[in-house]
Amino acid sequence: MENTESRLYFASDYMEGAHPAIMKKLMETNLEKTVGYGQDPYTEDAKEKIREACNAPEADVFLLVGGTQTNATVIDALLKSYQGVVAADTGHIATHESGAIEFGGHKVLTVPHEDGKISAAQIEKLVKDFYDDANYEHMVMPGMVYISQPTEYGTLYSREELAALSKVCRENHLPLYVDGARLAYALASPENDVTLTDLAEFSDAFYIGGTKCGALFGEAVVIPQKGRIPHFFTIIKQHGALLAKGRIAGIQFGELFTDGLYLRIGKPAMEAAEQIKAALK
């Protein structure tokens, strides 16, 4: 077999396994007997660490399997049957999830992007145009807004942009959901001014990516307002996103949120990106 250790790969950020600290902890705990479905001490510890990192002590935290399942589950849980989710026309749920949202019975209502992002003004106009239409009761109602941090183009929402989106969403009773599949990279970017605390303040739900950020798999959904999505555990199960061996995800997120690892784990990627940027100038 060809030795590929010295080769550079640009295809993806999840071609390798997991951070050594995660693998070490998984091996140390491998033969322990724990309760299933995320009711174990490791998962509870991970949830508490995430609440602390987000400065959201009352938040509901749930660990799911992967990004597409997470998006499909959260969006379905937040929408009524006749509602759709607003997203950029380049948004991940609109372009690279094989119609998973539509498969769940909800339309993705796309708006034109600017560098991968959408604005508060666009949301305001979309809502106004919807209710100004005499036939709006025959149409798919905008029921929530989806963004990702970073975007599909690798751009970042600023704190000011996020706050503006949050304001218009709350004025129009539209939950704001942030896809954080690659959130570790956003947090590590020198251009970033949005913290986990900001995400908890300005969004109705967001997830902290594990699969693309150092874990073998797993995403942590944070719902800042406790009880905001009733029976979410059961909804996760219904969508096939619940792990029987839940502690495997709990251990991973427990390690990611020990000694600031998650906040550091994206830095090598940022440093490499700066090297590429400098070389292309």
Listing of model-derived features with the role each one plays in the protein:
Residues 2-281:
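Conserved PLP-enzyme active-site core in the AAT-like
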